[in-house]
């Protein structure tokens, strides 16, 4: 008797779940997909790998694009990897040329500053393996990490892949991109001073 009641309860729960899911999927989607190339690039520039996008407010988005390919942006020193794009796909501003090797993660802090994780390094040109803070106008305000150097220390990263800034200004950097990375989270204060770290591969 108990088994019968349990079976009935499970069947009713399954039906209710199905109905709930069906009503969710039946809702109208307020968004539309854009076919073809949406962003209008300057003449002669080709679209490469898009590593990240982030909402900038007022319908605009920040886009990080790997300079027409998916490799070292320093090899194309005249191309800006960071772009601010409006709702119609027009580039409002761009910056970062000859500064970023391989843009990965992106974050906009409460003050509107843009943070970029540069997840690869170019030791010969002393760039990469850093996290950069830019103003909304593209002025470099801060860099955390040792330029072009891969490792594991308070201020040395190995493929930092993302960054987030808390409301109080504390900075959290996800350091590592794959099995060969450090795969840790490093915390700094708003001035870029080391506080602590946690996590490791497999944790």
Locate each region found by the language model:
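Bacterial N-terminal signal peptides that target proteins for export
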Residues: 1-11
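Eukaryotic scaffold repeat domains enriched in small/polar residues
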Residues: 25-203
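Bacterial N-terminal signal peptides
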Residues: 9-20
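Generic extreme N-terminus detector
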Residues: 5-6, 15, 25
């Amino acid at each position: 008797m108990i088994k019968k009641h349990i079976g009935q309860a499970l069947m009713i729960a399954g039906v209710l779940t199905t109905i709930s899911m069906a009503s969710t999927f039946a809702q109208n989607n307020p968004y539309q997909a854009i076919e073809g190339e949406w962003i209008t690039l300057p003449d002669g520039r080709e679209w490469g790998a898009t590593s990240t996008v982030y909402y900038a407010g007022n319908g605009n988005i920040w886009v990080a694009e790997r300079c027409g390919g998916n490799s070292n942006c320093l090899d194309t020193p005249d191309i800006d990897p960071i772009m601010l794009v409006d709702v119609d796909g027009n580039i409002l501003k761009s910056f970062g040329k000859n500064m970023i090797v391989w843009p990965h993660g992106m974050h906009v802090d409460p003050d509107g500053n843009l943070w970029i994780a540069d997840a690869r390094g170019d030791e010969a040109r002393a760039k990469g393996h850093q996290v950069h803070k830019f103003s909304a106008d593209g002025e470099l305000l801060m860099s955390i990490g040792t330029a072009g150097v891969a490792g594991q220390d308070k201020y040395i990263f190995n493929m930092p892949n993302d960054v987030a800034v808390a409301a109080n200004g504390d900075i959290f950097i996800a350091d590592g991109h794959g099995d060969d990375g450090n795969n840790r989270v490093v915390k700094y204060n708003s001035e870029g001073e080391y506080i602590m770290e946690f996590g490791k591969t497999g944790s």
